Amino acid sequence: QSLPACWDLSKADPAGVYSYWDHLDYIIKLAEQNGIYIGMVTIWGSQVKAENINAQQAKAYGKFLANRYKNSPNIIWVMGGDIQGDIHPEVWESLATSIKSIDHNHLMTYHPRGRYTSAKWWSKAKWLDFHTFQSGHRKYGQRMGNKDYPIPDNTEEDNWMYVDSTWAYKPIKPVLDAEPSYEDIPKGLHDPNEERWQDYDVRRYAYWSVFAGSCGHTYGHNAIMQMLKPGYPTSYGSDGAEKPWYVALNDPGFNQMKHLKNLMLPLPYFERVPDQSIIAGENGERYNRLLATRGNDYLMVYNYNCVPMKLDLRKVSGSRKNVWWMDAANGQLEYIGAFDNKVITFAPQKATRGISDGVFIAIDASKDYLKKDQKMIEDQSLAGKKRDLNE
């Protein structure tokens, strides 16, 4: 049990008992030893909605959490928990400010309800360091009877639009998709007869979001998020054929996320911005949507459907550009050639939706971020290496 009755926190961690909090200490320390950060969801939104905690209790709880974990280097505080921020906002405000009054060194964010961004309620909150949105698990047209819908109909999969809407709030803060569609989960979550999200879907969500201006991305898997064991049904759309979590580690989407990270980190990161003006033709709709991003001397365009693209190479420095195509599924690079600084039309040779999706990369020819004969980008992951989380 995590908390005693009536929020008497003096009894939350009894001496001589291996308590909930002792076990959480163990998990956080084990994660630190393996270079993993913990997104610490302080309380799930349903508990706040049910009024099982008030602002005064939240203040005391926040102090308890902050004092216990302020010296753990691998904590990111998460307010919310799949809930709209206008439902008892006084609880979230009290909890967040209480933690921040003691713990000044950890980042803090808010996890909203599906199809919302935290910026809708917390754009001015001093305690919030970066925004998240939840694009959710619905396919195009899957409104599912909702009367009050915060997005236009038939835009459910367009997660890039949440980045645009979040950037419109001031002050601008980093943002990422905290809950996109998860690999191997039914579209819409609960119906086992629905088709499931595949590797090419989770790739699309990742590249669309990051190229639209996200600072990172969240990958999820139906089995992994539940640490699903053999013999147990999944909580979401079980058809009786779910794999255990350790088998899901071999699934393609899980192993393809690294190619996006490997692409982004060797390039100048903090100068990168979204820039749809690179696309001199049509931006496209739905699966034909092109997403463009650039730095000062490089530009990239993600193309899910391999549609022909009209692109303006003049948007970044250099009278000549070296151009590559990167296969999003396997990270393989193909050097296309050198091009003059002008508008060009590029048509990917492999045109199979979601199977041959990839990234057009153009770099100022005077720069050496990539080599012409390079077949892959070096793995940028720090997982498995000794890492100082106090850095």
Regions found by a protein language model. Give the residues of each.
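Mature, folded catalytic cores of secreted/periplasmic enzymes
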Residues: 31-34, 40-44, 65-66, 70, ...
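Active-site mouth of glycoside hydrolases
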Residues: 1-142, 153, 157-158
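Catalytic-core region of carbohydrate-active enzymes that cleave or remodel glycosidic bonds
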Residues: 125-231
